[in-house]
A protein has these predicted regions:
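Sequence-specific dsDNA recognition surfaces
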Residues: 1-2, 16-45
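A structural connector/turn signal
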Residues: 37-38, 66, 110
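Extended boundary segments
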Residues: 1-12
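A short glycine-rich beta-alpha junction/loop motif
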Residues: 69-77, 85-88, 108-127
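Amphipathic alpha-helical coiled-coil/heptad-repeat segments
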Residues: 101-102, 119-148
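Short amphipathic alpha-helical coupling segments at ligand-binding clamshell hinges
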Residues: 86-93, 132, 139
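Short Ser/Thr-interspersed hydrophobic loop/turn segments at strand-loop and sheet-helix junctions
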Residues: 11-21, 42-59, 72, 76, ...
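Short beta-strand-centered aromatic/proline hotspots
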Residues: 61-65
């Protein structure tokens, strides 16, 4: 939860830096972070970020590449998965009605909607074998390409 700065070494991705599943990395602010904490919060390709509070609660972002050393802001949740789960398959799930229905059920209703890692870990996720996940992703990608 470090404050954003204009210059520095480590960038800090906020939910407001993500637009249409893209990050404009050159405008992501910097932050101060203890050197010992960097590896704990450092973003890697295939990480998925979730907004855990506010009007964008549940919004997710699949990190495809990380051209700069960057961490994620404190009001985001980061997940990493094993080789058993295709990151893009999970991202598509997080855009589905099943995901949003489960999120709504598990979201705390306060002045600012709120969810946490426990809410996400309790969700039911249809999980076919990895090979089938990649086939599903490819099929969805082809369908989206036709629409564009």
């Amino acid at each position: 939860n470090a404050p954003a700065k204009q210059c520095g070494r480590i960038r800090m991705v906020r939910i407001s830096d993500i637009h249409e599943n893209l990050v404009t990395w050159t405008t992501v602010p910097f932050c101060d972070i203890d050197e010992l904490d960097i590896s704990t919060y450092l973003l890697q390709p295939n990480d998925i970020l979730f907004a855990r509070t506010g009007g964008t609660v549940g919004k997710s972002f699949l990190v495809r590449d990380v051209p700069y050393e960057a961490i994620y802001a404190g009001y985001l949740i980061r997940t990493r998965y094993s080789a058993l789960l295709c990151p893009q398959y999970l991202k598509y799930f997080m855009e589905s009605p099943l995901y949003w229905q489960q999120l709504k059920t598990g979201t705390t209703a306060t002045a600012q909607p709120n969810c946490n890692g426990q809410t996400l870990s309790n969700m039911l996720l249809p999980l076919p074998p990895a090979k089938e996940q990649y086939r599903i992703v490819e099929k969805i990608n082809r369908a989206f390409a036709k629409v564009k």
